[in-house]
Amino acid sequence: VVIDIMPSSRRGEGLGYYGLTNNIAMSIGPMFGLFLHDGGVSFATIFCYALGSCMLGFLSASLVKTPYKPPVKREPISLDRFILLKGMPAGLSLLLLSIPYGMTTNYVAMYAREIGIHTQTGFFFTFMAIGMAISRIFSGKLVDRGKITQVIAAGLNLVIISFFLLASCVYLIQWNDAACTILFFGIALLMGIGFGIMFPAFNTLFVNLAPNNQRGTATSTYLTSWDVGIGIGMLTGGYIAE
């Protein structure tokens, strides 16, 4: 729907804002959940809040009106109805990049407590969301100018640096607690900028690889790679933590 209603000349910018809402939600969710948990709220109540958010999302989606689009005749069962074959290399790359994202959103709070960062770790996701919002200032327009791979490479470099610094916190905290805490939240900001410019650029890349009648398939491939990568990150992170 988003792809069909925006002009192609501003596709990168539009998909950037669309992706921003998804990424920020992935940051706000853990932050809100951690704040509730640290405040003594039961897990049952936390999941009730999650259910309420889902119901609001469903209500909002049901209010969206779109112009009629005639169906495209295809084979009843075919792989290209679900996966954009031309986008498989990009899908594998996105999957691998989503694995550390899944690990971070689920286990960074445990990591902070384990190394001795005594602060509200939920603010990590606040700064991450701020970083993602900052990324929208420039990345969408760069993508619209055709610099998709350059934007992805820049985001990747920022993410690599942020994970290196995150791993270094275990040593820095032995030297200075306050400096480590500041760095910890600075890492979240940097990581948010990195992921915030990469993921929408990937979405635009998938759409550009597909013909007009396969834009939905392109977005499906993008989201499948994203979801599978995050799932692998959660499982792998849990296995490593145990």
PLM regions: where:
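C-terminal membrane-cytosol helix-exit motif in multi-pass small-molecule transporters
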Residues: 52-70
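Helix-to-loop junctions at the C-terminal end of transmembrane segments
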Residues: 136-147
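C-terminal transmembrane helical hairpin of 12-TM major facilitator-type secondary transporters
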Residues: 149-202
